[in-house]
């Protein structure tokens, strides 16, 4: 999720499709809390958890990343972590993110930042954790990368 002048979800090689979604080139537009909730639910199952890692950034950094994501285009299957790590490495303050094809390695590299906040969602229902996450989402600074 990039929260800049507009809030989008970059879903590289993503499979989340619905007729009501505004999607172009693996970018889901209008990432309001309902869409974010649906996105988390879509990717979280009894054998897969979803971890959200957040870093607050300046408006300039968020806008720069947003523009690069929008111009990136659709990503081939199996290149999701590679595309995210490449885009982050081009972002001021994120140059030390490891280049990788592996989502777990990307998550570990991102977690090495001192300013990362993280929450993990499991199924079937993380109601309390989700309520706390959305309360926090409403209080955090406007510009960030999740």
Residue spans for each PLM region:
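Residues in flexible loops and secondary-structure boundaries
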Residues: 18, 60-65, 118
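Residue-level signal for the start and early helices of compact helical domains
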Residues: 30, 46-48, 56, 71, ...
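A structural motif
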Residues: 41-62
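Glycine-rich catalytic cores of cysteine/serine-nucleophile enzymes that process amide/ester linkages
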Residues: 1-48
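Activation targets extended, charge/polar-rich intrinsically disordered C-terminal tails
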Residues: 67-146
């Amino acid at each position: 999720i990039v929260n800049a002048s507009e809030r989008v979800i970059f879903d590289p090689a993503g499979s989340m499709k619905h007729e009501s979604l505004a999607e172009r080139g693996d970018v889901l537009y209008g990432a309001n809390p309902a869409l974010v909730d649906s996105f988390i639910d879509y990717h979280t199952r009894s054998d897969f958890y979803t971890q959200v890692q957040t870093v607050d950034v300046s408006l300039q950094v968020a806008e720069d990343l947003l523009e690069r994501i929008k111009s990136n285009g659709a990503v081939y299957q199996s290149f999701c972590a590679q595309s995210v790590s490449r885009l982050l490495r081009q972002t001021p303050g994120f140059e030390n993110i490891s280049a990788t094809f592996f989502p777990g390695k990307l998550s570990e590299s991102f977690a090495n930042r001192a300013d990362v906040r993280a929450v993990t969602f499991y199924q079937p229902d993380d109601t309390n954790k989700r309520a706390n996450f959305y309360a926090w989402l409403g209080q955090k600074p406007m510009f960030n990368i999740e």
